[in-house]
């Protein structure tokens, strides 16, 4: 009996050891560093350092990087560089010419090296009413375009750049644009209730009659922190004219409260720890800002950080100036 027990323990040990070894192998593969070529590495380093540059220098550097990436031979790293640059190019006001070069580069990379469709996701829909001869959950695959196409469609839809006709006819690009349009439709018809740092409850629909600027942010987000003083300045300047600014964070109050206190932010900061409102607005990256007019219509939005000058232009669309 003792020998059988010992044998089971030995077998269990080796099974556990194999599982741990497999987990370590997977973790190691996931953390494997990207290997850049001699031509790619300097560009990757420059992209990594963009946020440390002054805005006027950053604009020129971003444009120069877009042109240099375009000259690289086709590769997965070339696409990676183009996507990374695109994600940073919208953090402020670097000029239309700069954004156009970034979009042109991303489009050209996708033309020369198209990204395959990702594996379909499986959506599970639980039946609310019992059906005869059926039980459990119904599933259906949904096809999401690859992220680079979403990134390019985002630049076109929200930054108003242009891309070649053959890209706009691409099936994944069209799917990405359709997804963005559907997301905006959701944002047109929503309501939510959240509590602020003091425990006061705020309901979005009860703010009709005011221009409401909803800003999604986090304490760890550099561009969020950078635009916070401009949001505070706008709130102080236009609150008497009916502007309400609502900051929404998915972090704990213990992190948010000292940050807000140290920066003397006076507009309401709401907590969304379960990310229900983030999901309602389809927020997948921050900062994101949505501006609603006095009738509750979505009048303007920004996909990234904005300068005070840019915010003023957006507020004009909602009737604040």
Which sequence ranges carry the predicted segments?
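Mature extracellular/secreted ectodomains of secretory-pathway proteins
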Residues: 61-166
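N-proximal helix/coil linker or "cap" segments that precede and/or mark the start of modular domains
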Residues: 143-191, 205-208
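Short pre-active-site segment immediately N-terminal to redox-active cysteine/selenocysteine motifs
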Residues: 210-212, 216-220, 252, 285
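A short beta-strand-turn-helix
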Residues: 193-212, 238
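Bacterial N-terminal signal peptides that target proteins for export
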Residues: 2-14
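Thiol/disulfide oxidoreductase modules built on the thioredoxin-like
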Residues: 259-266, 271-318
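Bacterial N-terminal signal peptides
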Residues: 11-23
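Structural microenvironment flanking redox-active thiols in thiol-disulfide oxidoreductases
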Residues: 225-263, 273-280
């Amino acid at each position: 009996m003792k020998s059988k027990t010992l044998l089971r323990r030995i077998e269990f040990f080796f099974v556990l050891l194999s599982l741990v070894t497999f987990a370590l192998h997977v973790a190691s593969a996931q953390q494997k560093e990207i290997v850049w070529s001699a031509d790619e590495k300097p560009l990757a380093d420059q992209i990594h350092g963009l946020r440390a540059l002054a805005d006027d220098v950053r604009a020129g550097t971003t444009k120069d990087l877009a042109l240099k990436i375009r000259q690289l031979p086709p590769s997965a790293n070339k696409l990676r560089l183009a996507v990374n640059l695109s994600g940073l190019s919208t953090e402020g006001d670097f000029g239309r010419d700069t954004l156009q070069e970034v979009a042109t580069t991303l489009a050209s990379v996708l033309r020369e090296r198209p990204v395959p469709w990702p594996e379909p996701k499986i959506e599970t829909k639980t039946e609310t009413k019992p059906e005869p001869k059926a039980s459990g959950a119904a599933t259906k695959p949904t096809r999401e375009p690859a992220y680079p196409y979403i990134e390019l469609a985002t630049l076109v839809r929200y930054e108003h750049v242009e891309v070649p006709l053959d890209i706009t006819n691409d099936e994944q690009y069209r799917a990405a644009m359709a997804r963005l349009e559907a997301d905006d439709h959701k944002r047109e018809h929503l309501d939510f209730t959240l509590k602020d740092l003091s425990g006061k409850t705020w309901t979005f629909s009860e703010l009709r009659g005011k221009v409401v600027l909803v800003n999604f942010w986090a304490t760890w987000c550099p561009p969020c922190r950078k635009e916070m003083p401009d949001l505070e300045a706008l709130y102080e300047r236009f609150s008497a004219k009916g502007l309400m600014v609502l900051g929404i964070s998915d972090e704990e109050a213990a992190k948010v409260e000292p940050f807000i206190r140290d920066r003397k932010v006076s507009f309401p900061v709401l907590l969304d720890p379960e990310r229900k409102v983030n999901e309602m607005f389809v927020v997948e990256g921050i900062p994101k800002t949505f501006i609603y007019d006095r009738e509750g219509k979505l009048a303007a939005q920004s996909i990234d950080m904005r300068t005070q000058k840019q915010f003023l232009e957006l507020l004009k669309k909602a009737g604040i100036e």
